[in-house]
Amino acid sequence: MFLCENPGDQFHTRLRFSNRKSSGAVNIALEAQAQSNSIQTTLNWGNSSTVTYSGKLAAVAHFIREQKEANENKRKLPPLKTVINVQPTNVILNDTLWDIHPSQVVLDSGKVYVNDFYFSHKDRHLRINGIVSPQPEDTVRLDLKEINIGYVFDIADLGVNFKGEATGPAFASGVLENPVMSTDLFIRNLGLNEGLLGDANIHGEWHHDVKGIYLDAHIREKDLSLIHISEPTR
């Protein structure tokens, strides 16, 4: 369903659809209200499978065109700055309730400034801060604490089932042009396709020149052997 209307002095639109898969259907609803120089957007989704993945994302975007100085060319419009205020909402991942905390994202002069995006369940969390841009000196940092990497593979439905709780930092710079990425993670109870590999310390780097990832992993199975894996992957 798609609906557009113009009640009063605002523009209102709604979009609803379902994505059916063999594992069940995913229902998605998007609603936006625009008025003056701002847009309020809400995204709701939910599935119909045995394990629940659902939630709500809400944000208010303000568009600002800053005044130019008198000596500048008045024919050229100043750049548009967008300030997005992320609203507090909840998300259910694998039957577990997570909180999305208030944060702010600013788009200005070709850069994206992420200010304390915070996603948590009790002591577990994902926090993002930094600048996304083509410039190599601009870096964005992700901090993970006991984040189940299985969520990513469950949602993506890649046919590969990795499990484990990841803790540690990840960095990315020059993301929009020549990205340089690295991570140092401790993954507790790393598993693959229902098999337990053990606790893992993983260092990874994205090599833009070869379009591949270099991985150095130390995996220790409890009370047994230590496995060391070091190789580039493409």
Regions found by a protein language model. Give the residues of each.
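Interface amphipathic segments
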Residues: 1-230, 234
